[in-house]
Curated annotation (Swiss-Prot):
It comes from Thermotoga petrophila (strain ATCC BAA-488 / DSM 13995 / JCM 10881 / RKU-1). Spermidine binds at H77, D101, D170, S171, T172, D173. Catalyzes the irreversible transfer of a propylamine group from the amino donor S-adenosylmethioninamine (decarboxy-AdoMet) to putrescine (1,4-diaminobutane) to yield spermidine. Homodimer or homotetramer. GO terms for molecular function: spermidine synthase activity. Belongs to the spermidine/spermine synthase family. It catalyses: S-adenosyl 3-(methylsulfanyl)propylamine + putrescine = S-methyl-5'-thioadenosine + spermidine + H(+). This is Polyamine aminopropyltransferase. HAMAP family: Spermidine_synth.
């Protein structure tokens, strides 16, 4: 494993060093100015880059794909975590697969009912880099309720039966690295088996515009396993299309019928994106999304 190292000087602004990310198909993309390179490393699994942008703050990238920026990461992490957390009647034990930056863990730990949160990350260097350079998202790593496991999530979850109240899949892009293992029907079945009878599940399922193939495939596979499967959407400004999809699933809990808005209204921790109105609205899908999912 490569040792973490810091870059000792800022890059000269006149050099105009830019970060380019190409979306699926390589015809559209995102570019960000690099003010300062903070860290760059290569694990056995993937390339890790962390740099500073004047507008977005610290940016975290894996294999050239943006994972988080300081300015907008709350949008993604709050929607991925709080939708399932507020739908479970009393979430005590939570499993997060992926999410090595720590943002989803941070949001899960805002719920006082949580007694244990297991973060299963496949790449130990991501955890090490996040702990050192991504202070905003990795703040829950040392919480006494946190257990960090370095393992392949698809293999790890198979060890459990009827164990977790909530399982959250915070995977990387399925087109590169290890992310594809977390988009299989076998994996979703293992998650189903690891959940308690009243357990709930959520997963990031890509954007429904540029990544329509993966989006549809994830929904199809999850709905084969879980009797209740619902897609919901949220803004995510530095992800492809600016609109991101998540999929909620459960053995019996409905994300609209069983949602109690009073729980959100009475929540005493800071939320910058998620609220009771956003929860309900996020499950209202545009016609083009409904059509792709065969819902109209």
């Amino acid at each position: 494993m490569e040792k973490l190292k810091e870059f000792e000087r800022d890059l000269q602004p006149r050099q105009h060093l830019w970060y380019f990310e190409y979306y699926t198909g390589n015809n559209v993309g995102l570019f960000m100015k690099i003010n300062r390179m903070i860290y760059s490393g290569q694990s056995d699994i993937q390339r890790i880059d962390i740099f500073e942008n004047p507008d977005l703050g610290v940016v975290f990238s894996l294999d050239g794909i943006t994972m988080t920026t300081e300015k907008d990461e709350f949008m993604y992490h709050e929607m991925l975590a709080h939708v399932p957390m507020f739908l479970h009647p009393n979430p005590k034990k939570v499993l997060i697969i992926g999410g090595g930056d720590g943002g989803t863990l941070r949001e899960v730990l805002k719920h006082d009912s949580v007694e244990k949160a297991v973060l299963c990350e496949v790449d130990g260097l991501v955890i090490e880099a996040a702990r050192k350079y991504l202070k905003q998202t990795s703040c829950g790593f040392d919480d006494p309720r946190t257990e960090i496991v370095i393992a392949n999530g698809a293999e790890y979850v198979r060890k459990f039966k009827n164990e977790f109240d909530v399982i959250i899949i915070d995977s990387t892009d399925p087109t590169a690295g290890q992310g594809g293992h977390l988009f299989t029907e076998e994996f979703y079945q293992a998650c189903y088996d690891a959940l308690k009878e009243d357990g709930v599940f959520s997963a990031e399922t890509e954007d429904p515009f540029y990544d329509i193939g993966w989006f549809k495939l994830a929904y199809k596979r999850i709905s084969k396993v879980f009797p209740i499967t619902k897609v919901y959407l949220g803004f995510m400004t530095t992800y492809p299309s600016g609109m991101w999809s998540y999929t909620f699933a459960s053995k019996g809990i409905d994300p609209i019928k069983d949602f109690n808005p009073e729980k959100v209204k009475n929540f005493n921790k800071e939320l910058k994106y998620y609220n009771e109105e956003v929860h309900v609205a996020s499950f209202a899908l545009p016609n083009f999304v409904k059509k792709e999912l065969g819902l109209m």
